[in-house]
Regions:
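A short, gly/pro- and small-residue-rich
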Residues: 53-69
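Hard-cation-handling environments
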Residues: 31-53
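Flexible, glycine/charged-enriched surface loops at secondary-structure junctions
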Residues: 35-36, 43, 90-97, 223
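Single conserved hydrophobic/aromatic residue that forms the stacking wall/gate
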Residues: 1-11
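Short acidic, glycine/serine/threonine-rich loops at helix termini
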Residues: 50-55, 105-108
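Extended hydrophobic packing segments that form well-structured cores
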Residues: 135-223
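Active-site loops and adjacent core secondary-structure elements that bind or stabilize anionic groups
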Residues: 10-29
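C-terminal catalytic subdomain
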Residues: 66-170
C-alpha cells in the first residue's frame, strides 16, 4: 500500500530491527560529527556481520541530512556523488544495474537504500541479499534522469548518459528500490565494459553541465 513521504510504511519488520538500524545511524553520525566528515562510505558486509543490522537506513538518513553516504566502500561512486552534488545541488541514487534489455534499450537500477527526500513515497522493508535488517523501497517520480559514473585508476574516465524513468518496479529477485530507465544511449555499455557496478542516478537532465566539467578536467568519456 502507498504512503505519504515522511510517514513511511513498515512491511513485516520487527521493532528491534528499527532500533538496531537507528542505533547504527546515531553511531555513524557521531563519528561524522567528531571527525568533521561530510562524505562517508561503509563496508556493508562487515557491518552486517559485526552489528547484526544493515546500514541502509543510516545511509538514507545521512544523505537527507547533507552527509553524502555510500555503500560497500566504493570510493569511485562516492567521488561521483560528491561531484554531482557540487555541480547540480542534488544527491544521487547509487544503484546496481540489475536488469538490462538491449532490445528495448531499457535498464533497471536497484539498491536497498536511497535518500528519503529523493522519493515520492517509501516503504521500510528488509535487506534483499540477507533478508535481515532494514532496507528502503523508495518510489521515485517519473521523468528525465541522468546516469553518471567516474572511474578508472586515476578517476580520469567517466560514463554519462540520460534517459527517462518510466516505472518503479517491484521484482522479488533484486534490491528493494527499483527504477526502470528508458536509455537515450545504448544499454549495451552495462554488459560490455562498464566502469564498475554501481552507477549514480540524478533526477533531471544534467548531461551538458556534467560533461563540461569532466571534459575541462581532461577526463575521457566512455560509451
Amino acid at each position: 500500500r502507498s504512503v505519504s513521504r515522511g510517514l513511511g510504511d513498515v512491511y513485516k519488520r520487527q521493532p528491534e530491527d528499527m532500533l538496531k538500524a537507528m542505533r547504527l545511524y546515531r553511531a555513524i553520525k557521531r563519528v561524522c560529527k567528531d571527525e568533521i566528515l561530510r562524505v562517508v562510505t561503509l563496508s556493508c558486509s562487515k557491518m552486517i556481520e559485526r552489528t547484526g543490522t544493515t546500514g541502509c537506513l543510516a545511509l538514507a538518513m545521512l544523505n537527507d541530512e547533507g552527509i553524502l553516504a555510500g555503500c560497500e566502500g566504493d570510493l569511485q561512486s562516492i567521488f561521483t556523488l560528491l561531484a554531482a552534488k557540487a555541480l547540480t545541488g542534488k544527491v544521487g541514487f547509487m544503484a546496481n544495474p540489475s536488469m538490462i534489455n538491449t532490445r528495448t534499450n531499457e535498464l533497471i537500477l536497484a539498491h536497498c537504500t536511497i535518500g528519503l527526500k529523493q522519493t515520492e513515497k517509501y516503504i521500510i522493508r528488509n535487506h534483499f541479499e540477507t533478508e535481515s535488517g532494514i532496507g528502503i523501497q523508495g518510489l521515485l517520480p517519473t521523468g528525465d534522469v541522468t546516469i553518471v559514473k567516474c572511474g578508472g585508476e586515476c578517476l580520469d574516465e567517466y560514463y554519462l548518459s540520460t534517459g527517462t524513468l518510466t516505472e518503479n518496479t517491484n521484482f522479488i529477485n533484486m534490491c528493494r528500490t527499483q527504477v526502470r530507465i528508458k536509455m537515450n544511449t545504448p544499454a549495451e555499455y552495462f554488459l560490455k565494459n562498464p566502469l564498475g557496478n554501481h552507477h549514480i542516478l540524478i533526477q533531471g537532465n544534467y548531461e551538458v553541465l556534467l560533461n563540461e566539467f569532466l571534459q575541462a578536467n581532461t577526463c575521457k568519456r566512455t560509451e
